[in-house]
Amino acid sequence: MLREQNFDVIIVGGGHAGTEAALACSRMKKKTLLLTQNINTIGALSCNPAIGGIGKSHLVKEVDALGGIMAKAIDKSGIQFRILNSKKGFAVRSTRAQADRKLYSQTIKKTLLFQENLLVLQAEVDDVIVSNYKIMGVITQTKIKFFSKAVVLTTGTFLGGKIYIGSKCFLGGRINDYSSINLAQRLKDLPIKIGRLKTGTPPRINKHTINFSKLDVQYSDNPLPIFSFMGNQKEHPRQIPCYITATNEKTHEIVRKNLKKSPIYSGLITGIGPRYCPSIEDKIVRFSDRNAHQIFLEPEGLHDIEIYPNGISTSLPEDVQVEMIHSIKGLERAQITRPGYAVEYDYCDPRTLKLTLESKFIEGFFLAGQINGTTGYEEAAAQGLLAGLNASLYASNKCGWFPNRGQAYLGVLIDDLCTKGTKEPYRMFTARAEHRLILREDNADLRLTNIAKSMNLIDNSRWTRYVEKLSNIKNETTRLENLKIRSKLYSITELNNFFSIKINTESTAKDLLKRPEINYSTLMLFKKFSPGIKDKEAYEQIEIQEKYCGYIKRQIKAIKNQLNNDYIVLSKIKNYKVVKGLSNEVVSKLNFYKPYSLGQASRISGITPAAISILLIYLKKKLYST
């Protein structure tokens, strides 16, 4: 029986942000409550059945390094694994995996239900309890009150959600799931700026009605990639391929002819959709010079008959969707199992949040995921973990933590959101990170595991693996440095012939890794340099450090310069009118955004270098006068 109870932290929502937040809090030994509308949809992949991709996989690996569940779950449910940008540099290489929807959700759900310190309840939250601008708890639809020191709100697309299919409109945050109307109205009464965004999904297709013989096939990579730093290939289920087709002029003509029937173009939807995942209607209007748009036919699971046609998200009427699908090669007789639709929902301006994802105006109230204006499972999971760990720290009366832009893609994500805000669904890309050579997906554990350990976010097995990897890197680096290439020890002619290179001066085996044609594996083929280590993750780090040594040093220097301003805290300035010389516009923006540091202030639109100089002078005067 549900009754009033007290908790350290309450999580509202069981999506990717909510599950990571709940697990982070419970691992940090906090009495945690997760409230979700439907226990059966915990960890559901609401849109495409995939995890990772360009920039997104970096977030997944960082979540994993901080003890999160997403990478482990996809390793156990991924049915096609690939490395994107594999022919490019390590900084932009990204892992992506197709997921078996049911397996993925089951893995997440099982982890939560067996997690110590965590109670999962099925209940809809209608209200939050706020007293003197401090969060006190939540109230469910059935009027039960749950009290806590902190609340993490992760409502996804359910806050005031409306679903559109052609001219039809009905309430929902996902097809067949109710939207949160009362909670949406309650948030409008709080000091939170609310906006509207839109997302969408394509129709699903019965795989038995597709002519795959006409289509290109895309298989998993060999060897199979792994997401979690604690994972292995044996965890992967059976692998199956995806297929590729494309729209054509006939498809485009059908869409153009029916544009007025799309709620996006009829004026029914006012929310802005994702720029980097546009609907097929938007693609055909915005890219009118293109005569085809690629479509990836992605299986929804090993034993699922449904196919997800990635690339044709739409909210056109159902009859138009059928006509459109039948115009595409291989889908001439395809049967739609459920139509595509658009969802319009409320989001909160993330500029009203601290970098810890706590509200600047309501103490102990944290927001994470799509409610902050992002799109994507990975962005949500990363925010959820950060909000969860900070809610736990808050509940313990400890200072919050957040990574900087030179420390993690998560740092880039929250700095972009909380400093610049967003007017459209925000998606992570490697291009958003100015220090991406440092922030590779392969070294996320080296960047963040020790921090996770300090906050009790990880178990002993992960820490042991981390220490072992560091030791392997250090010892093997030292060994390669000590393998001197001198004429007395090695025949330089022998080396030159073996590697097809020209060495004229004395060097080391480690120096040879700087050459583009030599990697660690080929280096170990030279008997006098072998045997090497078997730890692939460790020797890849050695190789990367050598090949990009000069670039990495320059980026580290740039990060240090940037951090100089990020370490100058502004939180003691309550009203910027006291700083003489600032324009009214600058004062207004600084008072509204309340930047944490001088570095964050410098990244706010409209804050000039001159204003930053004035602030720096003011702070120095205050320092010397005390």
Swiss-Prot record:
It comes from the Bacteria. Keywords: Cytoplasm, FAD, Flavoprotein, NAD, tRNA processing. GO terms for cellular component: cytosol. FAD binds at residues 13-18, 125, 180, 370. The keyword Acyltransferase does not apply. GO terms for biological process: tRNA methylation; tRNA wobble uridine modification. Pfam families: GIDA, GIDA_C_1st, SAM_GIDA_C. Signal peptide: none annotated. InterPro entries: FAD/NAD-bd_sf, GIDA_C_N, MnmG, MnmG-rel, MnmG-rel_CS, MnmG_C, MnmG_C_subdom, MnmG_C_subdom_sf. The keyword Ribosomal protein does not apply. Its cofactor is FAD. Its main location: cytoplasm. It is found in: Cytoplasm. SMART domains: GIDA_assoc_3. Transmembrane segments: none annotated. Coiled coil: none annotated. GO terms for molecular function: flavin adenine dinucleotide binding. NAD(+) binds at residues 273-287. Belongs to the MnmG family. NAD-binding protein involved in the addition of a carboxymethylaminomethyl (cmnm) group at the wobble position (U34) of certain tRNAs, forming tRNA-cmnm(5)s(2)U34. Homodimer. Heterotetramer of two MnmE and two MnmG subunits. NCBIfam families: mnmG_gidA (TIGR00136). This is tRNA uridine 5-carboxymethylaminomethyl modification enzyme MnmG. The gene is mnmG.
